[in-house]
Amino acid sequence: MTERVKLTGASRRDKLLLWLKESTLPLTGGQLAKQANVSRQVIVQDISLLKAKNEPIIATSQGYVYIDSTGQQQAAEKIVACLHGPERTEEELQLIVDEGVTVKDVIIEHPVYGDLTASLRVGTRKEVQHFMKKINSTNASYLSQLTNGVHLHTLTASDEHRIQQACQALEAAGILITD
């Protein structure tokens, strides 16, 4: 049986960067902690230090992602305004991803803090299910509950037509704000 060696600060952060860069999927703090043989809290601190050094790491509902600016970019991006209650969140996300569109984030305008943005990066029904499961299991509130259901999403897709189709689906469902 092999015993995992606990990595020290700088070497652990180097490994974290390597693991994140090599991964095609988000990695959770728990997964990274297990690989590095440290607590999840140590990983959270390490990620904060890496972000402070301008490493393009984002935290999503599925885990940490390294955003490689040299990687493939989506050809089309659009910010859309939506309005609905919490009970329609899953429907909204599924309408979008069913058109081959990724929901990059959610943005609300807070009266004190200004724009608050949370990364979502949800692009498939499976990712929608994972997001919903996480919201429900943690009893977390949606950001849009702070603004009576009004919120923005940044949508990305391989082409503008997919985003137009998603917008039409949202409008037909009475979710898209058009005025």
Located regions from the model:
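Extreme N-terminal segment that seeds HTH/winged-HTH DNA-binding domains in transcriptional regulators
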Residues: 1-34
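Residue-level marker of alpha-helix boundaries and capping positions
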Residues: 7, 20, 37, 83-84, ...
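Solvent-exposed alpha-helical segments within well-ordered globular domains of core cellular machineries
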Residues: 14, 18, 45-48, 94, ...
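N-terminal helix-turn-helix
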Residues: 26-59
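Residue-level detector of family-conserved "landmark" positions at structurally sensitive sites
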Residues: 30, 60-61, 106, 145
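Minor-groove-contacting beta-hairpin "wing" of winged helix-turn-helix DNA-binding domains
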Residues: 57-68
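Mid-protein regulatory/catalytic core that forms ligand/cofactor-binding pockets
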Residues: 74-179
